[in-house]
Amino acid sequence: MSYVTTTDGVEIYYKDWGSKTARPIVFHHGWPLTADDWDGQMLYFLGKGYRVVASDRRGHGRSTQVGEGHDMDHYAADVSAVIEHLDLRDAIHIGHSTGGGQVARYIVQYGQPQGRVAKAVLVSSVPPLMVKSASHPNGIPMEFFDGIRAGLAANRAQFYVDFAAGAFYGFNRPDTKVSQGVIDNWWRQGMMGSAQAHYEGIKAFSETDQAEDLKRIEVPTLVMQGDDDQVVPYAEAALLQIKLLKYGTLKIYPGYPHGMLTTHGDVINPDLLAFIEA
């Protein structure tokens, strides 16, 4: 397996498929998953001739179960360590959910200053801010995130089964075809990681205000989200992101869930390709 060691000694696992001379696409996973969540997209774009790269966030999957740094700044720095190690340039960065926040922070702090990023995609992503606050009155009440923390602490294994079997993929909706394999794969990825990293990561994805990150992105950015996202409400995510981005394009998918990359990859993947090749 391939790893890069960060400046603070964390080993970050990554996948790197395809020709080293091909244009790179970098994928950023959501909470509490791993690079494996992008396997469908990685195979699709590998077949289109791209170089595809994805890493496990610190404390997640095969990366070091470190006790520190479970915040967007460290997430972005870890991504930069992988990108610099592989010397990726002219890259497209695609982030899902928490990974979208990671993409925004990476681009602003590293990708743009180093001239390494060409385009970005935010899929069902958490910016600008999830939690309700005085400056964000329509956000999600803190009690919701406290409930996630409580579920994780009480019985992480069962909580992850229930989360994947319910809102994440919209499997709780009537007449929805449920895939036990998809549920099991979500659970498998989640249980690979550190409970501490996942617990502390809730604060990172819910309480990090990234409005300024979005305003500072200077590359073309595609915003994609389903209007039946039960995890990250699209009215407080995609519809706000597009207002803050300088060069944004918005695509809303009627009836699609938070995990639409998996449930509707046959639609999402060609849309991603069209944006990348435009």
Regions found by a protein language model. Name each.
Residues A104-A154:
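Flexible "cap/lid" loop of the alpha/beta hydrolase fold
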Residues H74-A91:
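Conserved acidic catalytic loop of the alpha/beta-hydrolase fold
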